[in-house]
């Protein structure tokens, strides 16, 4: 239909080595030269455009989510309700009690300042090294572990034996003296569910840490 041929079109046809590809290219370029486009070609171009737009929008949303929020938005989102304030207050109280709990070990060197005079005099005159070792073990367990709180612990006698580094019979006698004679510890018989130890009693120290007397 055209008087002259497109040089670029002829050049592409000549450089194509496959006769089949050459025929295909000839038909496509002839349609382009005539301004004719297949419907499938138009749909393919439109689909590619839509994909590009979708990817661009996804990228924008991703960057928007990563962007830091302003202070007003942060304040609105993180404003604690009454329940959260109560939980925070309880956690703070537990933390303070836990810190005071750890000072029981230091209090052993200042029993004269936390015990009544007569009770301290009895302790000074009659206690043995083993009594002090068992009391020190109870002070340790009253400040560490999941089964403890301020001045209280629930622990098996076998665990006390290992901490005090004494025999079972010696620990038993010392515990009886601390409870019945010196009146420094209160004992409640019990057990810990799931524990391998048969005897897991509760022990309450009957004196406060030095800093909380």
Swiss-Prot record:
Q: Where is the composition biased (Polar residues)?
A: 12-21
Annotated stretches, region: Disordered: 1-21, 63-98
Enumerate composition-biased segments (Basic and acidic residues): 1-11, 63-93
Q: What is the name of this protein?
A: Uncharacterized protein YffL
């Amino acid at each position: 239909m055209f008087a002259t041929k497109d040089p670029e079109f002829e050049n592409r046809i000549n450089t194509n080595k496959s006769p089949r590809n050459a025929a295909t290219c000839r038909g496509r370029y002839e349609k382009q030269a005539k301004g004719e486009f297949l419907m499938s070609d138009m749909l393919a171009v439109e689909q590619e455009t839509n994909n590009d737009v979708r990817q661009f929008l996804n990228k924008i949303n991703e960057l928007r989510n990563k962007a830091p929020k302003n202070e007003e938005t942060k304040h609105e989102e993180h404003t604690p309700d009454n329940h959260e304030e109560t939980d925070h207050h309880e956690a703070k109280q537990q933390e303070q009690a836990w810190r005071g709990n750890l000072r029981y070990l230091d209090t052993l060197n200042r029993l004269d300042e936390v015990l009544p005079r007569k009770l301290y005099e009895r302790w000074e005159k009659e206690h043995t090294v083993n009594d002090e070792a068992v009391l020190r073990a109870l002070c340790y367990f009253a400040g560490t572990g999941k089964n403890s709180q301020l001045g209280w612990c629930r622990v098996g006698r076998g665990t006390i034996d290992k901490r005090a580094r004494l025999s079972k019979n010696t620990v038993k006698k010392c515990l009886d003296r601390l409870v019945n004679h010196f009146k420094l510890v209160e004992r409640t018989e019990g057990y810990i569910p799931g524990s391998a130890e048969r005897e897991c009693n509760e022990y309450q120290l009957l004196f406060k840490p030095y800093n909380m007397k």
